[in-house]
C-alpha cells in the first residue's frame, strides 16, 4: 500500500527505551507558539487604543448636567465627613448613588491635582463654576475607570473554551468595547457606565465558569455601585439559588423531612450568604446612622411615570395613544360618546390647555392621562414582576449559563418596558447581556438587530448639540454596519427551523424571510426618522411656528424606537420559551 504524502509539518518523534514514541521539545515549542499566536490574535488592545483616540477628541465637546453632578459628588466626598455625604444639599445635585460609588468618588477626589482643585473642581456650591482643567480631569477619570470593562471583555474571550467560541466572543466583546451607547452616554453626555458594565460582565463570566461565589460577589459589588442593577437581581438570585444552593435528590431510605432538609446545600448557602452580607456591611455599615436618608436618596418615589424624554417603552406608546385620543375627541364629534363610555374620563379636563402641554412630558411629579386610565407605581411593579417571573421559571428548571444570560436579558427587557420612571439609558441593561448570546444562533440576529438599532438610536436626543450631531450619527451607523456583517460571519447556523416562529432566521431563509425583510425595512425607515427630526431641530429657530411643536421630534423618536424594542422583546421571548436548541450547553 502506498504511503500517504505528508501535507504539512509533522510532529517530530524519537524512540524511547520502552519502544514508545516520544514528542520532542521542538513539537511542544511549535504547539505553544501556535496557541500563543491564536490567543494574541483575539486581543482587544488595538480596539482599546483606537477607541481611546476618539474619546480624547471628545474631551472638549458637549457635556450634560450629569458632569456637574459628578463634580459636586467629588466635592462632597472630599470636603465633608462620611456622615454628611447623604445629607448635604447645597446643590440640587445631591449624592444619590449607593456607597461604593461614593467611595469611588472619594478616591477620585484624592487624585485631583492642585491646579484642578483651584479651578473649582472641589467647591461645594449651588452652581458649579469650573473650566477646562476640571473638564479634562473628569473626562480622564471616565477613560481610566473603563479599564474595568476592557479587562472583563478580554477575560471573556480568554476563558472561552474553543477557538470557534473565542472567535464568536471576540466579535461580541469588540462590539461592546466600541458600543455607541457608551460613547454617547459616558464620553459625551458624561457618566461612568463602562466601569459598571465591566463588573456586570465579570459576574456573567463567573457564571459561565461555574464560579458561583465569584458571581455572587461581583453582583453584590455592582449593586453597591449602582442600584439600577436591582432589575437584574431576580435572575442572579434564581441562578445562584438553583445552581449552587439547591440539590434535588430524593433518598427513598430517608423520611420526608430529612429529604426536604437535604434539598438545601447548607454549606454552600452559608458561604454565598456570608460573601453577599459582608459586601453590603462594608458598603452600608459606615452609614448606619443615616440609613433612612440614604434609602430616601436611592429610591425617590415622587417622580412621574415617564422621564422628560419618554424612554422608548410601553408607556411611551401608552402616552402617545392618550395624545392621539385627545385629538380624536376634539376633532371628531362622533367619537365623544364612545370614548366617554369606554374610558369614563372627565371631559372638562381637556379644556385646560396648559395642563395638556405638560401633563405627559415626564416632569417630576405625578403624571396624569386625560382619556386613558392613569398608571400607578404598583401596576408597573406588578407588570415588571410578572414578566420577570415568567423568564425565571425556565431558569429554575434548567439553571445553565445560556438560560441565565437569557433570563438576565428578559429581566432587563421587563424592567425597561414596564418600569416606573425609566431612563432611556437603561436600554444598555438589555443590550449588554444579549450581545453575549447573539452569535449563539442565527435566529437571535433578528431581535438583536432591532434592539441595537432602536436602542442606540433612541439615545440620539440625549446629544442635541449641532457640533456632536455628526459624531453620534456617523459613529453609530458605522458601528452598526461593521458588526451587522461581522456577526453574520461568526454566528452559528440554526440547528432547527421553526416555521412561523414569530421572527426571522437572521439569514433571510426559511419561514422567516418575510419578517426578516420587514425588520430590515423598519430599520432602514429609522433613517427617515433621523432626517426628519434633524431638519426639525435645524429649522425650529428660523420658523417660530415650529417651536409650538417642541416635543414632537422627541415623541417621534420615543414611539418609533418603542415599537422596534417591543418587537425585539416579542421575538426574543419566542426563542427563549419555544426554541430549546439555542439554550443547550454545547460549545
Swiss-Prot record:
Q: Does the keyword Glycosyltransferase apply?
A: yes
- Which leading EC class covers this enzyme? transferase
Q: Where in the cell is it found?
A: Endoplasmic reticulum membrane
Q: Residue ranges, Lumenal compartment? A: 1-41, 161-169, 242-274, 322-378, 437-443, 488-518, 579-587
InterPro entries attached to this UniProt entry = Glyco_trans_ALG6/ALG8
Positions of the UniProt region annotated as Disordered: 1-30
Here the disulfide bonds are none
Main location per the UniProt record: endoplasmic reticulum
| Composition skew (Polar residues), residue ranges | 7-18
Ranges in the Cytoplasmic compartment? 63-139, 193-220, 296-298, 400-415, 465-466, 540-557
Q: Spell out the reaction equation it catalyses.
A: an alpha-D-Glc-(1->3)-alpha-D-Man-(1->2)-alpha-D-Man-(1->2)-alpha-D-Man-(1->3)-[alpha-D-Man-(1->2)-alpha-D-Man-(1->3)-[alpha-D-Man-(1->2)-alpha-D-Man-(1->6)]-alpha-D-Man-(1->6)]-beta-D-Man-(1->4)-beta-D-GlcNAc-(1->4)-alpha-D-GlcNAc-diphospho-di-trans,poly-cis-dolichol + a di-trans,poly-cis-dolichyl beta-D-glucosyl phosphate = an alpha-D-Glc-(1->3)-alpha-D-Glc-(1->3)-alpha-D-Man-(1->2)-alpha-D-Man-(1->2)-alpha-D-Man-(1->3)-[alpha-D-Man-(1->2)-alpha-D-Man-(1->3)-[alpha-D-Man-(1->2)-alpha-D-Man-(1->6)]-alpha-D-Man-(1->6)]-beta-D-Man-(1->4)-beta-D-GlcNAc-(1->4)-alpha-D-GlcNAc-diphospho-di-trans,poly-cis-dolichol + a di-trans,poly-cis-dolichyl phosphate + H(+)
Where does it sit, as one GO cellular component term? Answer: endoplasmic reticulum membrane
Which pathway is recorded for this entry?
Protein modification; protein glycosylation
Record-listed E.C. numbers: 2.4.1.265
User: What's this protein's name?
Assistant: Dolichyl pyrophosphate Glc1Man9GlcNAc2 alpha-1,3-glucosyltransferase
Amino acid at each position: 500500500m502506498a504511503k500517504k504524502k505528508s501535507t504539512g509539518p509533522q510532529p517530530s518523534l524519537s524512540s524511547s527505551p520502552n519502544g514508545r514514541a516520544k514528542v520532542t521539545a521542538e513539537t511542544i515549542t511549535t504547539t505553544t507558539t501556535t496557541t500563543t499566536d491564536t490567543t494574541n490574535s483575539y486581543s482587544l488592545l488595538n480596539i482599546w487604543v483606537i477607541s481611546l483616540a476618539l474619546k480624547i477628541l471628545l474631551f472638549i465637546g458637549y457635556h450634560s448636567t450629569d458632569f456637574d453632578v459628578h463634580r459636586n459628588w467629588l466635592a462632597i466626598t472630599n470636603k465633608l465627613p462620611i456622615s454628611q455625604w447623604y445629607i448635604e444639599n447645597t446643590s440640587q445635585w445631591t449624592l444619590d448613588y449607593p456607597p461604593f460609588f461614593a467611595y469611588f468618588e472619594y478616591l477620585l477626589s484624592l487624585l485631583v491635582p492642585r491646579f484642578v482643585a483651584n479651578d473649582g473642581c472641589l467647591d461645594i456650591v449651588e452652581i458649579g463654576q469650573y473650566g477646562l482643567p476640571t473638564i479634562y480631569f473628569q473626562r480622564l477619570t471616565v477613560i481610566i475607570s473603563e479599564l474595568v470593562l476592557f479587562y472583563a471583555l478580554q477575560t471573556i474571550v480568554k476563558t472561552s473554551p474553543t477557538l470557534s467560541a473565542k472567535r464568536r466572543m471576540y466579535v461580541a466583546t469588540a462590539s461592546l468595547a466600541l458600543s455607541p451607547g457608551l460613547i454617547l452616554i459616558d464620553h459625551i453626555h458624561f457618566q461612568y457606565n463602562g466601569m459598571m458594565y465591566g463588573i456586570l460582565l465579570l459576574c456573567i463570566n463567573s457564571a459561565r465558569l461555574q464560579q458561583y461565589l465569584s458571581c455572587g460577589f461581583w453582583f453584590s459589588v455592582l449593586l453597591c455601585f449602582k442600584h439600577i442593577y436591582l432589575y437584574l437581581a431576580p435572575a442572579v438570585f434564581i441562578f445562584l439559588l438553583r445552581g449552587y444552593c439547591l440539590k434535588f435528590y430524593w433518598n427513598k431510605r430517608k423520611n420526608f423531612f430529612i429529604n426536604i432538609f437535604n434539598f438545601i446545600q447548607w454549606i454552600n448557602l452559608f458561604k454565598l450568604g456570608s460573601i453577599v452580607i459582608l459586601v453590603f456591611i462594608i458598603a452600608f455599615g459606615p452609614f448606619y446612622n443615616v440609613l433612612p436618608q440614604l434609602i430616601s436618596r436611592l429610591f425617590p418615589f415622587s417622580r412621574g411615570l415617564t422621564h422628560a424624554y419618554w424612554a422608548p417603552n410601553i408607556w411611551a406608546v401608552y402616552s402617545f395613544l392618550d395624545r392621539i385620543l385627545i385629538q380624536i375627541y376634539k376633532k371628531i364629534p362622533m367619537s365623544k360618546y364612545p370614548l366617554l363610555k369606554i374610558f369614563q374620563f372627565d371631559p372638562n379636563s381637556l379644556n385646560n390647555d396648559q395642563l395638556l402641554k405638560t401633563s405627559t412630558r415626564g416632569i417630576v411629579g405625578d403624571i396624569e392621562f386625560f382619556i386613558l386610565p392613569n398608571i400607578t407605581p404598583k401596576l408597573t411593579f406588578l407588570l415588571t414582576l410578572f414578566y420577570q417571573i415568567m423568564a425565571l421559571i425556565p431558569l429554575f428548571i434548567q439553571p445553565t449559563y445560556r438560560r441565565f444570560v437569557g433570563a438576565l436579558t428578559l429581566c432587563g427587557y421587563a424592567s425597561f418596558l414596564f418600569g416606573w420612571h425609566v431612563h432611556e439609558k437603561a436600554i444598555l441593561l438589555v443590550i449588554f447581556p444579549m450581545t453575549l448570546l447573539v452569535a449563539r444562533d442565527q435566529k437571535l440576529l433578528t431581535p438583536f438587530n432591532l434592539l441595537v438599532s432602536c436602542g442606540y438610536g433612541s439615545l440620539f436626543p440625549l446629544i442635541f448639540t449641532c457640533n456632536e450631531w455628526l459624531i453620534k450619527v456617523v459613529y453609530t451607523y458605522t458601528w452598526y454596519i461593521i458588526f451587522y456583517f461581522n456577526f453574520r460571519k461568526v454566528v452559528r447556523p440554526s440547528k432547527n427551523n421553526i416555521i412561523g416562529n414569530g421572527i426571522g432566521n437572521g439569514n433571510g431563509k426559511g419561514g422567516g424571510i418575510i419578517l426578516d425583510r420587514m425588520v430590515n425595512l423598519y430599520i432602514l425607515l429609522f433613517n427617515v426618522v433621523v432626517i426628519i427630526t434633524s431638519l426639525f431641530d435645524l429649522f425650529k429657530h428660523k420658523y417660530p411656528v415650529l417651536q409650538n411643536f417642541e416635543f414632537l421630534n422627541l415623541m417621534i423618536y420615543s414611539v418609533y424606537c418603542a415599537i422596534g424594542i417591543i418587537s425585539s422583546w416579542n421575538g426574543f421571548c419566542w426563542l427563549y420559551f419555544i426554541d430549546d436548541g439555542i439554550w443547550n450547553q454545547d460549545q
